[in-house]
């Protein structure tokens, strides 16, 4: 009888310790006080970089309806670089990672936001420069290793007008972006995971050679474009989660991007 009591006590003790450990482990996984959606809703009006015979607006095409088929379903007409989306390194560089090959640990990273809204309000061709990075770090501290650096230019306020693409009468685009020197600095000196912008491209619109894309992707980093609500997250201290679609050989894709802290 005493042996039975001892055995029961031992089992209960082990169970109790196990439950307490499970509670402890579960409670320490992650704690989120704030969450912000950094993704624009994609629809047929969403602007895109115009490339003759290549790019086109998003289209939602009904496939089935509840009335006719007993189920509601749509197909999408979409190219990889529409809406809030992720660019993979193979977008410009041969033999680099495709979207599905980007490691998950590189898609959940610290995020910092560098504000150039004042410059962008004065010039559509404004650039985020190394000087802007230095000024940011003097105020907020060094940009963390393996982080995402977002440029906030306030450009999303132009989403529904022609300034977002900024085509002039020679069909040259005008919108803010990172300078190539800034991207080089972030890749070499700060070992970033990726960068992002609230405009159409992280290269300024006037750079039709996409110099910054090539610099970033040669280093195997990713970029996100048309990011929303960057003015609603802290300049430092948040984590960004890049919900890039896992499509084999993709050079990019519409993504759900969120910030938490």
Predicted features by range, described:
Residues 2-10:
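Sec-dependent signal peptide recognition
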Residues 20-261:
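Active-/binding-site microenvironments in catalytic and ligand-binding cores
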Residues 1-3, 21-22:
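Intrinsically disordered, low-complexity sequence elements enriched in Ser/Thr/Gly/Pro
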Residues 15-18:
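C-terminal motif of bacterial Sec signal peptides marking the signal peptidase cleavage site
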């Amino acid at each position: 009888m005493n042996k039975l009591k001892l055995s029961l006590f031992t089992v209960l003790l082990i169970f109790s310790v196990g439950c307490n450990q499970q509670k402890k482990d579960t409670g320490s996984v992650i704690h989120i006080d704030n969450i912000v959606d950094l993704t624009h809703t994609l629809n047929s009006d969403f602007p895109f970089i115009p490339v003759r015979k290549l790019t086109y607006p998003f289209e939602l095409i009904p496939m089935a309806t509840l009335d006719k088929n007993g189920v509601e379903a749509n197909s999408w007409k979409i190219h990889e670089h529409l809406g809030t989306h992720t660019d993979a390194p193979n977008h410009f560089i041969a033999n680099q990672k495709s979207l599905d090959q980007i490691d998950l640990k590189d898609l959940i990273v610290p995020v910092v936001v560098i504000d150039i809204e004042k410059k962008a309000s004065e010039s559509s061709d404004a650039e985020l420069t190394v000087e802007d990075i230095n000024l940011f770090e003097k105020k907020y501290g060094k940009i963390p290793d393996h982080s995402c650096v977002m440029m906030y230019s306030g450009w999303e306020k132009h989403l529904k007008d022609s300034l977002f693409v900024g085509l002039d009468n020679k069909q040259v685009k005008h919108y803010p972006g990172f300078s190539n020197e800034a991207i080089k600095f972030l890749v070499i000196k700060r070992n970033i995971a990726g960068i992002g912008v609230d405009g159409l491209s992280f290269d300024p619109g006037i750079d039709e050679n996409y110099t910054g894309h090539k610099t970033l992707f040669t280093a195997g980093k990713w970029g996100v474009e048309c990011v929303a609500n960057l003015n609603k997250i802290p300049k430092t201290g948040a984590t960004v989660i890049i919900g890039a679609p896992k499509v084999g050989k993709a050079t990019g894709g519409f993504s759900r991007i969120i910030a938490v802290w």
